[in-house]
Amino acid sequence: MPDEFTVTPWEVKGKVDYDKLIVQFGTQKITEELKQRIKNLAGDLHVMLRRNVFFSHRDLDLVLNDYEKSKGFFLYTGRAPSLGMHIGHLIPFIFTKWLQEKFNANLYIEITDDEKYMRNPEFTLDQTRSWAYDNILDIIAVGFNPDKTFIFQDTEYIRNMYPITVKIAKKLTFSEVRATFGLDASSNIGLIFYPALQIAPTMFEKKRCLIPAGIDQDPYWRLQRDIAESLGYYKAAQIHSKFLPPLTGPEGKMSSSNPETAIYLVDDPKTVERKIMKYAFSGGQPTIELHRKYGGNPEIDVPFQWLYYFFEEDDNRIKEIEEEYRSGKMLTGELKQILIDKLNNFLEEHRRRREEAKELVHVFKYDGKLAKQMWEKIHE
């Protein structure tokens, strides 16, 4: 009997069978042919494409068609602000930065301080706005182009978005929104209206919009795809990623509510070492003797999976690590140490860039070339 798994926008449980998920969601697999097209246009392939971390799509082929015809496309992603971001939160942003660089695309990043406030009874609006600022620093630290990126908070940009949002809202029924977003009779009316706000940025330009996100977010965009053409816009295209497994094992995804499952961007080197050594699920054997004899299983080993997803970009080196671990030559502790060193180097550089980002917030939100254009626009 195959393992059962659940993937919704609110919950990821079990060991996900991504091939089955493609069938369930009705998306398309990113084929080798499609990857070759991307490589021909971009000049190379991001590690997350080479290793099938981004594995599924909707209309990515049409996005590439438009690019080849010099129509271009734009990128859209977002963040519901939280008290702290972890490594898993950065995956779509890191990949989006590569797409922006390679395809010279405008990027819109929606910070949903309103939705976070409305969804959680215990949060105040001041709290979610404060978290938004901190999260924006982490996002800017990824390295986006300040003149081609507009970061906006819903509570600040609502006046400019409201006309198109009203048109979107008129096309959506309560029953559709309730089913897609998991609402019920006790949900506040702000949450019922919010999906229209989330769809609005897909209509910021009269080009095709590409959304890089986790596969669990796919249902949110089905509503947009149902109504976009009736408003004179393209259906939003998506490129979907797998979930970076939590430290505790290959099932589910990292959770902010369970600190032991995640490495946070603020974790210091000692915290990183402690978490990896103590919590990172191992595919190794229970003793050194057995490990030397039988080797480890990289498929279920979380430190290996993290290296494979992103932290060891050299394909020859990751193959070497896999072979040494599988043969028993490399021990679990040695594999964990490789990840610890990679993580701490990454986080040290991220913190440096985050400090620099404090001087750039106004550029991304208000003063950059794209930001200025956006504040002069009313979207209708």
From Swiss-Prot:
Where located? Cytoplasm
| One Pfam family hit | tRNA-synt_1b
The protein's Enzyme Commission number: 6.1.1.2
Q: What is the name attached to this protein's record?
A: Tryptophan--tRNA ligase
Q: Which GO terms describe its molecular function?
A: ATP binding; tryptophan-tRNA ligase activity
Sorted keywords for this record are: Aminoacyl-tRNA synthetase, ATP-binding, Cytoplasm, Ligase, Nucleotide-binding, Protein biosynthesis
The chemistry this enzyme catalyses reads: tRNA(Trp) + L-tryptophan + ATP = L-tryptophyl-tRNA(Trp) + AMP + diphosphate + H(+)
Q: Name one GO cellular component term.
A: cytoplasm
NCBIfam families reported in the protein's UniProt record: PRK12285.1-1, PRK12285.1-4, trpS
